[in-house]
């Protein structure tokens, strides 16, 4: 079942797309967008998670700047629009919005109160920030840009964390990837997987660098991780 809800956050209200599984109660996964907003790709990801037995909740992260952003990943104009939103985005405020979304998901009547966060690109960074600053049951990061700038916060990580990095990612350099791996190697509850030959957003539906084999491997690891940590 698909619906839209309103989350009452610390700084105001914002919308979220919700996909529910057939069988409840169920654990929840907060799904965090790229620069394209809660678009068709993010909604499809939520629907797939619901089919696997999770309540998927995708909050509108850009609500302070522009509500209900829904951009086409194949449009250059939309890419430039999303990039402008990304460059002006307040990451600290965004992490608090994610914290508020996690709290709202846990309070849903059909939720078991177990909540993970999963994010892509900007959403991947916010997943990392949420995991090191606040309480979540599990975290999954897909190619979180600029994560290397926040590695001094890794000591705050308590929840299990799974990270996916494309080795050829044009937005996350090899030195940045090595720094991320080194920092997380000190955390026994963190696992980082590298995907040879893969670029940024290799797992994104309809993305320019989509690779079905690598995406299936990464997503399979994600689904197994979520089932183990949330059930």
Predicted regions and their residues:
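N-terminal cap/leader regions of alpha/beta-hydrolase-fold enzymes
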Residues: 1-231
């Amino acid at each position: 079942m698909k619906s839209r809800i309103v989350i009452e956050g610390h700084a105001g209200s914002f919308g979220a797309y919700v996909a529910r599984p057939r069988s409840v109660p169920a654990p929840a996964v907060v799904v965090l967008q790229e620069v394209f907003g809660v678009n068709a790709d993010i909604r499809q990801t939520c629907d797939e998670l619901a089919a696997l037995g999770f309540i998927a909740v995708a909050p509108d992260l850009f609500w302070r700047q522009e509500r209900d952003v829904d951009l086409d990943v194949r449009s250059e104009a939309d890419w430039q629009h999303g990039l402008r939103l990304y460059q002006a985005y307040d990451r600290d405020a965004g992490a608090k919005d994610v914290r508020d979304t996690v709290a709202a998901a846990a309070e849903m009547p059909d939720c078991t109160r177990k909540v993970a966060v999963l994010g892509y690109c900007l959403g991947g960074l916010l997943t990392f920030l949420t995991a090191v600053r606040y309480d979540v049951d599990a975290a999954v990061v897909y190619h979180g840009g600029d994560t290397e700038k926040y590695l001094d916060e890794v000591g705050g990580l308590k929840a299990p964390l799974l990270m996916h990095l494309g080795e050829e990612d044009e937005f996350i350099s090899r030195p940045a990837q090595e720094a991320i791996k080194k920092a997380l190697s000190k955390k026994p509850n963190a696992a980082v997987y590298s995907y040879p030959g893969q670029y940024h957003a290799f797992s994104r539906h309809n993305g320019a660098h989509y690779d079905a084999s690598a995406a299936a491997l990464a997503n399979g690891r994600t689904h197994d991780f979520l089932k183990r940590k949330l059930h």
